[in-house]
């Protein structure tokens, strides 16, 4: 009879991830799933990651990609709708991470408790004719609510913020954390990796190279003219004609619009954004692990310019963005672009600050 009891207990544990009512508090009482180092079943110790907005266009693909990451031992999937379905689907993948789903505002705290990394793609997507700033009124409130949960339940977690407009939502998150007394500028990271991925891809097309061999620093922000690719600093070192510079800069800045228009109302850049978010999250996890020289571009608190936040290359480590790199030498085209970017960014950042301080 004891064997049957143990079997029933194991079955209950395996199916628990499909029940949104299953909480970390319940987990702690369980001698197997509540192990101190949070091992995945049969796996190695890893990190606890939460995705807020896991059932959305970006969130579903991102959930799949993070389930595949060997550095993740526990993956919490949260959304206000459809979280159980995404959780069940992703949980059938035979990779090491244990997956649990959380549904609705009442379970936000359970989804966040004890997390090492929180990724936030939640919010409404862009539609044809919309700019990222058009999303502000809806997404600003969503980010505020979710970051209040982070401040309460996992104040030491690294936060990867994807929700647009990133140029404003990072400032919103910072103000929420300041109010809660938990703000650590090194741990709040706006995800601009897709701008870099696009830059690498488009530049590689012009140069006839594999995109994996190309590195283009992209600085500034994450919308329109605030996205500034530094083509003078491309690796491998390359030269471009004025027309190529104009073409590449415009295409990189308008990459999101290109996808929105191509999908003709059926969505935005969800797949490439999920890829970029997973790539950046992996870099953050490698930094947390203590890997050396983990360098990515991110929109962070910065003293590189007079603005409070700015996207540049950063070195990721155990405490987040441990080093923020300077811009380096710019050519005249880039200096003009930088001034345009800063002017636009200043208003977007202030808009986020005012949303919380109003």
UniProtKB/Swiss-Prot annotation:
Q: Does the keyword Oxidoreductase apply?
A: yes
Pfam families, per database record: Ldh_1_C (PF02866), Ldh_1_N (PF00056)
Keyword Plastid attributed:
no
Note the CDD domains from the entry.
MDH_glyoxysomal_mitochondrial (cd01337)
GO MF terms here are:
L-malate dehydrogenase (NAD+) activity
- UniProt record, GO biological process: glyoxylate cycle; malate metabolic process; tricarboxylic acid cycle
Recite the UniProt keywords alphabetically.
Glyoxylate bypass, Glyoxysome, NAD, Oxidoreductase, Peroxisome, Transit peptide, Tricarboxylic acid cycle
Kindly report, in one word, the top-level EC class recorded for this enzyme: oxidoreductase
Checking SUPFAM superfamilies in the record gives: LDH C-terminal domain-like, NAD(P)-binding Rossmann-fold domains
Q: Which reaction does it catalyse?
A: (S)-malate + NAD(+) = oxaloacetate + NADH + H(+)
Q: Which residues does the Swiss-Prot or TrEMBL record annotate as the active site?
A: 222
Q: Which residues bind substrate?
A: 126, 132, 164, 198
Subcellular location per UniProt equals: Glyoxysome
Residues that, per the record, bind NAD(+):
53-59, 79, 139, 162-164, 273
EC?
Answer: 1.1.1.37
Q: Where is the transit peptide?
A: 1-38
Q: Name one GO cellular component term.
A: glyoxysome
Domain of life per record: Eukaryota
Member of which family? Belongs to the LDH/MDH superfamily. MDH type 1 family.
Q: Quote the subunit structure annotation.
A: Homodimer.
Q: What is this protein called?
A: Malate dehydrogenase 2, glyoxysomal
Protein species of origin: Brassica napus
């Amino acid at each position: 009879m004891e064997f049957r009891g143990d079997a029933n207990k194991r079955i209950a544990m395996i199916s628990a991830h499909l029940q949104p009512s299953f909480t970390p508090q319940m987990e702690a009482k369980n001698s197997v799933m509540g192990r101190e180092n949070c091992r995945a079943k049969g796996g190695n110790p890893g990190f606890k990651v939460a995705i807020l907005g896991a059932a959305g266009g970006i969130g579903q693909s991102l959930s799949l990609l993070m389930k595949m990451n060997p550095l993740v031992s526990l993956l919490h999937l949260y959304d206000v709708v459809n979280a159980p379905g995404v959780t069940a689907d992703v949980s059938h993948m035979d990779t090491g991470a244990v997956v649990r789903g959380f549904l609705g505002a009442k379970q936000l705290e359970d989804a966040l408790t004890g997390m090492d990394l929180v990724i936030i793609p939640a919010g409404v997507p862009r539609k044809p004719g919309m700019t990222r700033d058009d999303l502000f009124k809806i997404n600003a409130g969503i980010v505020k609510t979710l970051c209040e949960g982070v401040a309460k339940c996992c104040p030491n977690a690294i936060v990867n913020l994807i929700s647009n407009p990133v140029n404003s939502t990072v400032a919103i998150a910072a103000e929420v954390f300041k109010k809660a007394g938990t703000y650590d500028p090194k741990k709040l990271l706006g995800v601009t990796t897709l701008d870099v991925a696009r830059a690498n891809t488009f530049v590689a097309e012009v140069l006839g190279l594999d995109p994996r061999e190309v590195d283009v620093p992209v600085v500034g922000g994450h919308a329109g003219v605030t996205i500034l690719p530094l083509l003078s600093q491309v690796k491998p070192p390359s030269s471009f004609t004025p027309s190529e510079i104009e073409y590449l800069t415009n295409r990189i800045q308008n990459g999101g619009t290109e996808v929105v228009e191509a999908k003709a109302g059926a969505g935005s850049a969800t797949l490439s954004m999920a890829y970029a978010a997973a790539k950046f999250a992996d870099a953050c996890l490698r930094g947390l692990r203590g890997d050396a020289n983990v360098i990515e571009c991110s929109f962070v608190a910065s003293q590189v310019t007079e603005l409070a936040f700015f996207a540049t290359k950063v070195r990721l480590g155990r405490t987040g963005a441990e080093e923020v790199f300077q811009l380096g030498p710019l050519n005249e085209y880039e200096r003009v672009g930088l001034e345009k970017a800063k002017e636009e960014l200043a208003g977007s950042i202030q808009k986020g600050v005012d949303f919380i301080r109003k």
